[in-house]
Swiss-Prot record:
InterPro entries: AAA+_ATPase, ClpA/B, P-loop_NTPase, Torsin
Binding sites annotated in the UniProt record for ATP: 189-196
Pfam families cross-referenced by the UniProt entry: Torsin
Start and end residues of each stretch annotated as Disordered: 41-60
Coiled coil feature spans: none
UniProtKB keywords: ATP-binding, Membrane, Nucleotide-binding, Phosphoprotein, Transmembrane, Transmembrane helix
PANTHER family, A to Z: TORSIN, TORSIN-4A
Compartments (UniProt record): Membrane
Entry-annotated residues carrying Phosphothreonine: 84
Domain of life: Eukaryota
Name this polypeptide is given: Torsin-4A
């Protein structure tokens, strides 16, 4: 190096370690000079082999430029100065969310409040429907209508249509506990066809399922309102008894049963009282009740109808494809004629569900004898039952034998069997 410029490198004490360091510093210094020379203009080139500059530069400015960071580029200084700087576009900065916060994104579809209200309404209606179905099952189990139907089919002979209509009306009414009007069943037919027997079976069944005999009222016209008694007293007594029964049933949330036998003997004042009890203007606990009227009114019309249409009646134990239509047409005619006849007597039968009981055929009377014999302790022998049935009077029409008195004389005939062994011993 030139002696006029003292070296900035420290003097090495030994040639062993300092020599490589000096070489590195020398190379670094050379690289810096070459970078600076490339950036200078052509007239201000430094002297070759030395670190001095030309007349336009000095060592102080070179060191000041070396201290600032420079970036290497292949463009010359004139090209860099001639370029116009481009205006950079400002990019939209990406919004960064903290990891601990919740990212709230805009909703693509905004649900209206009406849709939410509709969904809530559908849920409420579905819940009410399920609750109603459960109530239907509870009422059916409480009153054991299946057991009642089996008991009626087993004990009532010759009246399948009447039993089916009674059970259909009871199932429809007892499906719910709240009603808008009471149920009035009017069982009509001639003597001995099983009306009173059905009334006793209904009363026995409801006493068992309700577990309270006070909720079943049986009213007999001849017994509770005999001829010398004033009619107004009977009317007040009937109204009070009905009010007590329905009030107790309302407190226990049950449906009471009120059976009125021999309704054809009831005075008009009592029929008026019953008609008032069935009105919708009454208190709501009067609506939750079942009334059963057992009446012989219309028995003559039913007898004439059966005898005139005996040829259209199906024989027993026969089930054909057209049996439904064959049975429905006469039954509808009979119901229409009975309703017109009874409505002329009193307006009570306008709201009643009329159930006609037809005449009993001879095989049905034989079954009545066997049933009574078994109940009295006798062996229900078929031949003996047929022999007893031969002693009754019948209508002989179109190959059928209809009992004139039905099963009314069965009890008396069976009671006579107890004296036959005594007569045989003589």
């Amino acid at each position: 190096m030139d002696r006029s410029h003292p070296s900035l490198e420290p003097q090495a004490k030994g040639p062993c370690v300092i020599a490589p360091v000096r070489a590195v510093l020398r190379l670094r210094r050379r690289v810096c000079v070459l970078r600076k020379r490339r950036l200078l203009q052509p007239g201000t080139e430094p002297d070759s082999g030395t670190g001095t500059l030309g007349p336009t530069g000095s060592l102080g400015t070179l060191r000041a430029d070396l201290d600032q960071p420079k970036f290497f580029t292949f463009d010359s200084l004139t090209e860099l100065t001639s370029r116009t700087p481009r205006k950079r576009r400002r990019r939209s900065r990406v919004v960064l969310y903290p990891e601990t916060s919740r990212k709230c994104r805009p909703r693509t579809e905004r649900q209206s409040r009406a849709q939410r209200c509709l969904l809530l309404l559908v849920a409420i209606v579905g819940f009410q429907v399920l609750n109603a179905i459960e109530n239907l099952d509870d009422n059916a189990q409480r009153y054991d209508l299946d057991g009642l139907e089996k008991a009626l089919q087993r004990s009532v002979f010759g009246q399948p249509a009447a039993v089916g209509r009674i059970m259909a009306l009871l199932r429809d009414y007892l499906a719910t506990h709240v009603h808008s009007h009471p149920l009035l069943l009017a069982l009509h037919g001639p003597s001995g066809v099983g009306k009173s027997h059905v009334g006793r079976l209904l009363a026995r069944h409801f006493r068992a399922v309700l577990e309270d005999g006070a909720l079943v009222l049986q009213y007999h016209a001849r017994y509770h309102c005999p001829e010398p008694r004033p009619v107004q007293d009977c009317r007040k007594e009937l109204a009070q008894r009905v009010a007590d029964v329905v009030a107790q049933a309302e407190a226990e949330e049950k449906t009471p049963l009120l059976v009125l036998d021999e309704a054809e003997l009831l005075p008009p004042a009592l029929l008026d009282e019953l008609h008032d009890l069935l009105q919708p203007q009454r208190s709501h606990h009067f609506h939750n009740a079942i009334y059963v009227l057992l009446s012989g009114a219309g028995g003559i019309e039913i007898t004439h109808f059966v005898l005139q249409n005996a040829s259209r009646m199906l024989p027993p134990l026969r089930h054909s494809a057209g049996s439904t239509q064959t049975e429905e047409s006469p039954a509808q005619e009979l119901l229409t004629s009975l309703r017109e006849l009874l409505a002329r007597e009193h307006p009570l039968w306008h709201t009643a569900a009329i159930v006609p009981f037809l005449l009993l055929d001879k095989p049905d009377v034989v079954n009545c004898f066997r049933e009574e014999m078994a109940g009295e302790g006798f062996f229900p022998e078929q031949a003996l039952a047929e022999h007893l049935a031969e002693q009754l009077s019948y209508y002989h029409v179109a190959g059928h034998e209809f009992a004139i008195t039905g099963c009314k004389q069965v009890v008396a005939k069976v009671n006579l069997l107890q004296h036959k062994p005594a007569h045989a011993g003589h």
